[in-house]
Design a protein with these regions (language model features):
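N-terminal amphipathic/hydrophobic targeting modules at extreme N-termini
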Residues: 2-4, 14-16, 20, 24-28
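Acidic, Ser/Thr/Pro
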Residues: 31-221
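Short intrinsically disordered, low-complexity coil segments enriched in acidic
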Residues: 1-7, 74
Length: 221
């Protein structure tokens, strides 16, 4: 029940990822609307999910970090809250089986499958243009924050209170032995690893194929 396209191949630092929407409940749909797509390197995509639908994110090259946001489909003032999720799960970062909640404490996404090493990050802010300028980049550099805004706009929505706080899927941020310091490390996923989320409410999900090529977060930078 899924139509797929051939994944793009690239030797660039920022590889592409695939996302796939799989209808789990008996809902009317067309194959054209529910298919595997490729997120181009350094760009983003957004998708609307109904409660009970699944979103499968496949790391086809095994080296890509994916920044992810989610909003209540009928109220974009309600959004995925990582700080509230940490309170809910009592974990530093989400794991298989965990439910992610919104700023209104409502369940929005649950991790139902994860073939990766299970390393994801909920602490680091997404990259944005000021971040790259502070890293010494002149002019414009594609970034996850703009990718998020663009992808949601493509669906005809405007995010009322955009946040830098994204769930950084596959990102490897280690807590050091002192219990305080963090270390940014390359991702540990392998080609074909995937994570699947189940929507707990009608929602909009945005994903960015992270363009970060200054700080070593992608495993082939």
């Amino acid at each position: 029940m899924v139509w797929s396209t051939d994944a793009a191949t690239s030797n660039d630092v920022n590889q592409t990822i695939n996302w796939q929407c799989i209808i789990l409940s008996a809902l009317p749909f067309s194959l054209k609307e529910n298919r595997m797509k490729t997120i181009e390197a350094c760009h983003g995509k957004a998708i609307e999910l109904k409660a009970g639908n699944s979103l499968k994110v496949i790391n086809i090259h095994g080296s890509q970090v994916v920044d992810l946001w989610a909003w209540n489909g009928s109220n974009l003032n309600e959004y995925l809250s990582l700080e509230a999720t940490r309170v809910w799960s009592q974990r530093l970062n989400p794991q298989l089986g965990d439910t992610l909640v919104t700023n209104m404490r409502n369940p929005i996404l649950t991790i139902v499958q994860d073939t990766s090493p299970g390393i994801h990050d909920s602490f680091m802010a997404c990259c944005d243009l000021p971040r790259y300028h502070r890293l010494g980049v002149n002019g414009y550099h594609r970034n996850c924050f703009d990718n998020m805004l663009e992808s949601v706009s493509e669906l005809g929505y405007k995010v009322p209170n955009p946040t830098l706080a994204s769930l950084n899927v596959f990102m490897n941020i280690a807590v050091l032995e002192d219990g305080i310091s963090l270390a940014t490390r390359p991702v540990e996923t392998k080609a074909g690893d995937y994570i699947t989320f189940r929507a707990e409410m009608d929602c909009i999900v945005s994903m960015s194929s992270c363009p970060q090529d200054i700080v070593k977060i992608q495993s082939d930078v």
